[in-house]
């Protein structure tokens, strides 16, 4: 349950203690599980919250002094990135904008929870006509120029993100030989690989279950440029999920699994690897599914989107004129 009225606020002491906590290892259905989904900021959970918080912390002086005290991010409708960024902004006392594809207010499903939570955290929600992620990303770029805000991209400082995740490998048992996890951007699993080397773990193979080609891009951009002494000695075996990104996979598991992300990696693991404590599932997090959080969005529109709207209206008027 998210407590909006008594939400944590930033202090150096709280931040350093909170972000350096090691999340636990548990057992589920015969597999070991790294419960990074239990990392929590006032009810918003998961390892991505830690990544975003550290990214903002590392740039906090710049954001306050050079970016008008604000951050913004672009996100797809199913992505928890909008909620996470807004929650982190509230924690640090920053202004926040998010850009997402515009949708009608009558739609009520789990995909609409993130934008409503963003608004509840105080973010302004900017709607974009282009439903593909390229639409919000372009709008975010335009809004950076318009507002001066600092743009949050989880892949913008890949080395720092990987290092943040790598530190969580410290409490992985020495008998773990195989690690499985979901790969959206892929930085989480690349960070796990980095951590296995950092803490001299006995892991032989890591299976990132990919939802897109982003992991290959980020591996080339961030991981492959590491010094040989910082790279995982075992096999980094990328496998493609049989499910598309937009597909919701609902598994009958007592372990809470995100339907867009973690469930697909868990499904691959159970179909391909026999239960063993030597196999560890890396659970990054789970987004909020409670539909009671949904509220009407007070949509904002960037100057860029308003120009696009005017151009579309002009073309439509021209078509009507030509027809008659």
Regions found by a protein language model. Name each.
Residues 273-324:
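Phosphate-binding loop/pocket of nucleotide- and phosphate-handling active sites
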Residues 83-130, 215-227:
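Active-site-proximal loop->helix
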Residues 1-69:
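Positively charged, low-complexity intrinsically disordered leader regions
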Residues 75-83, 105, 158, 181-192, ...:
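Gly/Ser/Thr-rich loops at beta-strand to alpha-helix junctions
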């Amino acid at each position: 349950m998210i407590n909006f009225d008594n939400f944590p606020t930033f202090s150096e002491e709280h931040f350093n203690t909170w972000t350096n906590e090691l999340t636990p290892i548990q057992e589920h259905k015969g597999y070991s599980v790294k419960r990074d989904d239990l990392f929590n900021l006032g009810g918003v959970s998961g390892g991505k919250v830690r990544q975003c918080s550290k990214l903002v912390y590392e740039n906090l002086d710049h954001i306050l002094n050079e970016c008008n005290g604000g951050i913004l991010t672009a996100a797809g409708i199913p992505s928890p990135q909008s909620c996470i960024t807004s929650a982190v902004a509230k924690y640090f006392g920053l202004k926040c904008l998010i850009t997402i594809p515009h949708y009608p207010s009558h739609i009520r499903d789990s995909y609409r929870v993130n934008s409503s939570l963003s608004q509840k955290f105080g973010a302004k929600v900017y709607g974009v006509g282009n439903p593909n992620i390229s639409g919000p990303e372009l709008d975010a770029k335009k809004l950076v120029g318009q507002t001066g805000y600092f743009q949050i991209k989880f892949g913008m400082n890949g080395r720092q993100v990987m290092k943040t995740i790598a530190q969580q490998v410290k409490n992985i048992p020495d008998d773990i030989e195989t690690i499985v996890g979901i790969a959206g951007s892929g930085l989480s699993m690349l960070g796990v690989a980095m951590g296995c080397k950092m803490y001299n773990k006995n892991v032989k193979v890591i299976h990132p279950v990919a939802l897109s080609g982003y992991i290959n891009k980020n591996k080339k951009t961030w991981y492959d440029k590491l010094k040989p002494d910082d790279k995982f000695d075992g096999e980094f075996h990328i496998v493609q999920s049989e499910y598309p990104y937009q597909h919701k996979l609902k598994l009958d598991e007592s372990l809470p699994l995100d339907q867009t992300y973690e469930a697909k990696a868990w499904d691959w693991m159970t179909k391909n690897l026999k239960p063993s404590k030597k196999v560890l599932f890396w659970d990054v997090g789970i987004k909020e599914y409670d539909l009671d959080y949904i509220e009407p969005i007070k949509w904002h529109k960037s100057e860029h989107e308003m120009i696009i709207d005017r151009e579309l209206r002009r073309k439509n008027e021209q078509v009507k004129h030509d027809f008659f």
